[in-house]
């Protein structure tokens, strides 16, 4: 029996979920799928400039797991940029904590609010 997936915590659902090269019709594009937690890892490490340990803590994963997530994300983004592929952001094993809810016990899951103690 496989292990149940562990949730990765993200600040919010992405507002933009599709990126494509200009001048190439959608019908001719290959896609790379970037998960929501991979996008969050890129946001925390590369955009916010946080240390890997802090990023892992915020996503509630171990440092080795964070390293695997960020490595996968960077590889997918590099593939899309170098090879002219579209990037679709979707899926993953994540829950949304929301900036105003961090540390308050209540977290928003993709399907509504719940308490950490539940």
From Swiss-Prot:
SUPFAM superfamilies per record: Sigma3 and sigma4 domains of RNA polymerase sigma factors
Domain of life: Bacteria
InterPro entries: RNA_pol_sigma_r3/r4-like (IPR013324), UPF0251 (IPR002852), WH-like_DNA-bd_sf (IPR036388)
Name of a matching Pfam family: DUF134
Assigned protein family: Belongs to the UPF0251 family.
Cross-referenced PANTHER family: PTHR37478, UPF0251 PROTEIN TK0562 (PTHR37478:SF2)
Descriptive protein name: UPF0251 protein TTE1845
Species of provenance: Caldanaerobacter subterraneus subsp. tengcongensis (strain DSM 15242 / JCM 11007 / NBRC 100824 / MB4)
Organism phylogeny: Bacteria, Bacillati, Bacillota, Clostridia, Thermoanaerobacterales
């Amino acid at each position: 029996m496989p292990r149940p997936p562990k949730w990765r915590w993200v600040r919010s659902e992405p507002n933009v979920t599709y990126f494509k090269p200009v001048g190439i019709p959608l019908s001719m594009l290959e896609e790379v799928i970037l998960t929501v937690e991979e996008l969050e890892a890129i946001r925390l490490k590369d955009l916010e400039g946080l240390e890997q340990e802090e990023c892992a803590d915020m996503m509630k994963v171990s440092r080795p797991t964070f390293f695997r997530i960020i490595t996968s994300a960077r590889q997918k983004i590099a593939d899309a940029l170098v090879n002219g592929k579209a990037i679709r952001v979707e899926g993953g094993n994540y829950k949304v904590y929301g900036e105003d809810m961090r540390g308050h016990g209540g977290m928003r899951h993709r399907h509504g609010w719940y308490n950490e103690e539940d």
